[in-house]
Amino acid sequence: MTKIDPYKSKEAWIKWKAKTQSIPGLSNINSTLILKYLDDMERGINVSILSKKGGRSYIRLKSSKSKLLFLIKSFQDTYNVDNIGNLTEEQLINFFSDMRKGAIKRKDGGIYKSVRDFTKNFKAFWHWYQKISNKAGKEIPDITVYLDSSGTKPDWVYLTESQVRLLCDNAKFEYKALIMFLFDSGIRAPTELVNVKVSDLINDCKELNIREETSKTFGRRIKLMICPELLKEYIKVKNLKSEDQLFDICPSVINRNLKILGKNVFGDEKSLAGQKYSEITMYDFRHISCCYWLPRYKSESALKFRFGWKNSDKIHYYSEMLGMRDTISDDDMLIDITKTEIEQELQKSKREREIQQDQIDTLHLQVQKLAEYIKQLEFNIRSNFN
């Protein structure tokens, strides 16, 4: 089964490249630079030594393209920079500062919430530009040194377990299975989700195999603890075969219907994670699942494995510690030395009890032997008198 691309990123990328000899709205120099940069990123050439080797994904390429085209065109229009190499550090800092303040707005009039993403994309481009210029014998200063790459995390929808079940109770049957599967597995949706086949469900739907070739990071086999029975019913009702997609869905349609369901069940209020219930999407269930499993897993490494994470900071990013509870106990208040002393005393008492028990057993055995001796003595005396 070929990996399914729910966003059709590869198809869109190839189509755009085929029809684009130069980029409309950009000067020849800037257009040539952007096309060369994107081509290098696709092939994995001239990338930072700190970055992973190999070409960038089509999703990443599309995202970089859209952000860079916006930035370079804005620099042209705002600062009359027909050669991006002539952009100054001050111009760059001022532009991104205006983006953060809301002086530069989106086409719909809204404020840019993820300025950090634009910053990171431009930094990557500029460092590439420095590298290729250096190879050509021209030294280019790093004007991105003081560029602020920090940013606030986007709001998301938080649901408790009881709220997830309430949402499920009010959903159509197909959505019940999807909601509980997302909640239980914490799978990346839609990218990993749409690539799950029925045959990836193992051990009577109690385990899920997320294949290496379909995962963003690494393949993994995880346990399903909440949704197995619902999945079995879903597969039976839908008459799905082994090689069928478990959820053959259109992500935009699913997300639209989830938002309607969220509003109908919870209203238009904000959840604890800042986003309105009426804005819930499949992606939110990865956050929600992390919050559910975090206090239940005994080790951080096991939790990271379940969610396909390599770095521990993802745990806080996805959970923000929502749903956590204080599990401190009286036993935890004993420092290691005190606990060791108590354990030693308990061990000593145990040994003393064992010695006492041995002494009692020995005494009991001696009493038994004495009783037998007296009994035999009485028998001998009676025999002599007779």
In which residue ranges do the predicted regions lie?
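Short, charged phosphate-coordinating catalytic segments
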Residues: S133, L182-C205, S301-A302
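Basic, Lys/Arg- and aromatic-enriched nucleic-acid-binding interface segment
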Residues: E161-P190
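Conserved tyrosine-mediated DNA breakage-rejoining catalytic core shared by Y-recombinases
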Residues: N195-E233
